[in-house]
UniProtKB/Swiss-Prot annotation:
It is found in: Cytoplasm. Mn(2+) 1 binds at residues 268, 345, 347. GO terms for cellular component: cytoplasm. It comes from Methylorubrum populi (strain ATCC BAA-705 / NCIMB 13946 / BJ001). The gene is pepA. Its cofactor is Mn(2+). It holds the Pfam family Peptidase_M17. It catalyses: Release of an N-terminal amino acid, Xaa-|-Yaa-, in which Xaa is preferably Leu, but may be other amino acids including Pro although not Arg or Lys, and Yaa may be Pro. Amino acid amides and methyl esters are also readily hydrolyzed, but rates on arylamides are exceedingly low; Release of an N-terminal amino acid, preferentially leucine, but not glutamic or aspartic acids. This is Probable cytosol aminopeptidase. Keywords: Aminopeptidase, Cytoplasm, Hydrolase, Manganese, Metal-binding, Protease. Its EC number is 3.4.11.1, 3.4.11.10. GO terms for molecular function: manganese ion binding; metalloaminopeptidase activity.
Length: 497
């Protein structure tokens, strides 16, 4: 599934033979230090001539790939542009790592991480490795003939000023990459493979990292009173599950945790309110929010994060059947609040309602964040490059926004006003599960807010970014694994001690 990229660290003085040599230049095309020494005069002259003929200006995210000249111990020279001095000062190291891995392809390469004015830290180098690992990902185990080999199997030797420091920092980055890759794998799996019981089994594998796992089956959910979640699952031949993951990494195990909640609808046909056939195959990705939670717990446990975090996901399949829940049904949620079903395709909020209520009642978290591919309306509003953020807490909202900006997973805060809450009032129950056509993402968030008590809470609607998102230098996958890097950054900056 993953590309299996190998990354090693060597001092800048290291020299080798064969493979590619990767060097970096600004818009002045200047080579200096170790890069100039490795290329020598023949290599430097070739770069100048080729740049002129190919109109290579050294702009950021541009590259020149050349056969190595005689006298240079390499097969190819890969010259990567960094742009102007201003561009270099704001280098996105994760994207640079992905771009570099893309240019190297499935080859071996010595990458000289040094250039004029270079001031990269071990953390920057670690981010570079994260990007390279994410770029090398592929999901092709169901292909029996042509595999996706073009960027897989690369071996990068990074020549850096502090190999031991970079290697230590890169271990954490590797843990995050594992979490993103796990999330991508889960989203990409077909629903006949990743049905609820199998999903719960895969979550249970996190015990090998020290994560405590509890799986709630149908009997336990009925005992608790999770009527909203169970209603969604009625039409499926596959029983639902709730998977709860606890990572206790803080020095004080009794410290209240951060809670992460995910929607895990492994396939959403729409139920009785069935979706149109066109694009229904994408609904295997309607569990992208839950995948982000599972991937984050993996990353935190793998890097031994000094924080207490609980993750909980509701895993169901929404299918039409003689036993399916129907429009006009009234179901009772775990909170005791009743819900009139208007549209069975607005099922994710019912799943989240019971899980949110259970988590805050059981674990008394210091904050709750839920992630869900919840509404098409958020795609209309924000497209496929940014997630919608709804929150009852300005401080938490600001922290999430900053973490997303730093991690390259951007969010945009959306309004939560009384009018949206009023739109879900029902004539027959405490609320209805849709608020009509207008403001669909906001009325869905208002629905969830009714299941949040006095705790800082944020809802991330990731329908646009969680699946079939815009390709980038670090993602060529249909399932992006969106949210893992944001949440890991959030925990690192605000919840670790």
């Amino acid at each position: 599934m993953a590309g299996g990229i190998e990354i090693a660290f060597e001092p800048l003085s290291s020299r080798g033979r064969g493979g590619d040599v990767v060097v970096f230049v600004g818009d002045d095309l200047a080579l200096s230090g170790p890069a100039a020494e490795i290329l020598g005069r023949p290599g430097a002259e070739l770069v100048v001539r080729a740049a002129a003929s190919e109109r290579f200006k050294g702009k950021a995210q541009s590259a020149l790939v050349l056969p190595a000249p005689a006298g240079v111990e390499a097969d190819r020279l890969v010259v990567i542009g960094l742009g102007s001095e201003k561009d270099r000062a704001k280098t996105d190291w994760t994207l640079l790592g992905g771009f570099t891995a893309g240019k190297v392809g499935g080859r071996s390469a010595r990458v000289v991480l040094d250039w004029p004015g270079y001031a990269g830290s071990a953390r920057d180098v670690a981010d570079f490795t994260l990007g390279a690992r994410l770029r090398s990902y592929r999901f092709d185990q169901y292909k029996t003939k042509k595999k996706d080999e073009d960027e897989a199997g690369a071996a990068l030797s990074l020549l850096v000023a502090d190999p031991s420091g970079a290697q230590a920092a890169a271990r954490d980055a590797a843990a995050v990459a594992e979490g993103v890759i796990l999330a991508r794998n889960l989203v990409n799996e077909p629903p006949n493979v990743l049905y609820p019981e199998e999903y719960a089994r895969r979550v249970s594998e996190l015990t090998s990292l020290g994560v405590e796992i509890e799986i709630l089956d149908v009997a336990r959910m009925k005992e608790l009173g999770m009527g909203a979640l169970l209603a969604v699952a009625q039409g499926s031949a596959r029983e639902p599950r709730v998977a709860i993951m606890r990572w206790n990494g803080a020095d004080d195990p009794s410290e209240p945790p951060l809670a992460l909640i995910g929607k895990g609808v492994v396939f959403d046909s729409g139920g009785v309110s069935i979706k149109s056939a066109g694009g229904m195959e994408d609904m295997k990705g309607d569990m992208g929010g839950s995948a982000a939670v599972v991937g984050t717990l993996h990353a935190l446990a793998a890097r031994k994060a000094k924080a207490n975090v609980v993750g909980a996901i509701g895993i169901v399949e929404n299918m039409p059947d003689g036993n399916s829940y129907r429009p006009s049904d009234i179901v009772t949620s775990l909170s005791g609040q009743t819900i009139e079903v208007i549209n069975t395709d607005a099922e994710g909020r019912l799943v989240l309602a019971d899980v949110l209520w259970h988590v805050q009642a059981t674990y008394k978290p210091k904050a709750m964040i839920d992630l869900a591919t919840l509404t098409g309306a958020i795609i209309v509003a924000l497209g496929q490059d940014i997630a919608g953020l709804f929150s009852n807490d300005d401080a938490l909202s600001a922290q999430i926004t900053a973490a997303g900006e730093a991690a390259g997973e951007k969010v945009w805060r959306m309004p939560l006003i009384p009018a949206f809450d009023k739109a879900i009032d029902s004539k027959f129950a405490d609320m209805k599960n849709t608020g009509g056509r207008h403001g669909g993402a906001a009325t869905a968030a208002a629905f969830l807010k009714r299941y949040v008590n006095d705790v800082p809470w944020a809802h991330l609607d990731i329908a646009g970014v969680g699946m079939s998102s815009t390709p980038s230098e670090i993602n060529r996958s249909w399932g992006a694994g969106w949210g893992v890097r944001l949440l890991d950054r959030l925990v690192r900056e605000h919840y670790e001690r």
